[in-house]
């Protein structure tokens, strides 16, 4: 693993740690100003879609935080190649609107440049959307 890949892996790991603490400000500080988050999710999920720029990415986190209570978010693997970091894991949560308890496996793809996240793509299995129905 190159020094750059190690640094990128550490950066993404620190983002997961901040998410666990609810520290969205830290996460936003790790992003490029024009960062792009894309949640490839069923439109029923409030944070599905594309969010470009830090202000819009902040809205992504607001929608997520207003919609669900995350009870567990283990990261199973973090793998880096060049400027790309891929992470896999699971999430357990409750949906505030429906009261349903849900779980989902996920894959997140981060692209970094100069130590900042340029893009993030989120993929979850159907368990996430089902909890919103």
Language model features: what each stretch is:
Residues 1-29:
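Short, low-complexity N-terminal intrinsically disordered segments enriched in polar/charged residues
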Residues 2-4, 62-133:
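A beta-strand edge to alpha-helix "cap/lid" segment located at domain peripheries
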Residues 6, 51-54, 104:
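Short, conserved loop/turn and helix-capping segments at secondary-structure boundaries
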Residues 6-17, 36-41, 57-61, 82, ...:
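Short charge-dense sequence patches
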Residues 12, 16-19, 31, 61, ...:
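Hydrophobic alpha-helical core bundles mediating ligand binding, dimerization, or RNAP-core interactions
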Residues 12-15, 27-28, 35, 53, ...:
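Hydrophobic pocket/interface hotspot
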Residues 26, 32-80:
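A solvent-exposed, acidic/Ser-Thr-rich amphipathic alpha-helical stretch
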């Amino acid at each position: 693993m190159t020094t750059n890949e190690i640094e990128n892996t550490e950066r993404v790991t620190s983002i997961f740690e901040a998410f666990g603490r609810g520290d969205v400000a830290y996460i936003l500080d790790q992003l490029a100003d024009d960062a792009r988050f894309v949640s490839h999710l069923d439109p029923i999920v409030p944070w599905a879609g594309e969010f470009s720029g830090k202000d819009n990415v902040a809205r992504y986190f607001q929608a997520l935080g207003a919609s669900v209570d995350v009870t567990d978010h283990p990261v199973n693997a973090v793998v880096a190649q060049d400027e790309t970091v891929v992470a896999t894991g699971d999430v357990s949560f409750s949906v505030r609107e429906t009261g349903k308890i849900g779980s989902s496996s996920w894959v997140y793809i981060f692209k970094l440049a100069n130590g900042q996240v340029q893009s993030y793509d989120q993929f979850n299995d159907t368990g996430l959307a089902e909890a919103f129905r």
